[in-house]
């Protein structure tokens, strides 16, 4: 235990917590331009072709963003919105593309969980 005199000389340092999404600069979302849209394979027990995009953000960061949902219309130079949220089986992918915002279309024919994929309510 430090003495009062020691604490006067050198106060206790606050704990600094590390962010999982440094490129967002404490913002909920960020806009960026796709520099490359491609597929990649997940880590060991899983097998698939996951759709991802390399994105140059407005703050200068270049990050990899996962494109969720079935099918997408993204290509190079598409302007997209990204949010935080990692993909556990893709190392280095710490961001998600927001579907239905800017140049990224929502998932067509989506019936359930529509808000997460930018799909409008279907006509009954």
Swiss-Prot record:
MF annotations from Gene Ontology: rRNA binding; structural constituent of ribosome; tRNA binding
Keyword tRNA-binding: yes
Swiss-Prot/TrEMBL keywords: Methylation, Ribonucleoprotein, Ribosomal protein, RNA-binding, rRNA-binding, tRNA-binding
Pfam families linked to this entry: Ribosom_S12_S23
Top-level lineage group: Bacteria
GO biological process: translation
InterPro entries: NA-bd_OB-fold, Ribosomal_uS12, Ribosomal_uS12_bac
Family: Belongs to the universal ribosomal protein uS12 family.
Function: With S4 and S5 plays an important role in translational accuracy.
Record's subunit section: Part of the 30S ribosomal subunit. Contacts proteins S8 and S17. May interact with IF1 in the 30S initiation complex.
Protein name: Small ribosomal subunit protein uS12
Species of provenance: Shewanella woodyi (strain ATCC 51908 / MS32)
Gene from which this protein is expressed: rpsL
């Amino acid at each position: 235990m430090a003495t009062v005199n020691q604490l006067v000389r050198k106060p206790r340092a606050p704990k600094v917590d590390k962010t999982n999404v440094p490129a967002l600069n404490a913002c909920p979302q960020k806009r960026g331009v796709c520099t490359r849209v491609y597929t990649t394979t997940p880590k060991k027990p899983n097998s698939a072709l996951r759709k991802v995009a390399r994105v140059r953000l407005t703050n200068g960061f270049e990050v990899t963003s996962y494109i969720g949902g079935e099918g997408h219309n993204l290509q190079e130079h598409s302007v997209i919105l990204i949010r935080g949220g990692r993909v556990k089986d893709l190392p280095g992918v710490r961001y998600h593309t927001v579907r239905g915002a800017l140049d990224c279309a929502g998932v067509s024919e989506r019936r359930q969980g529509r808000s997460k994929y930018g799909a409008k309510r279907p006509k009954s």
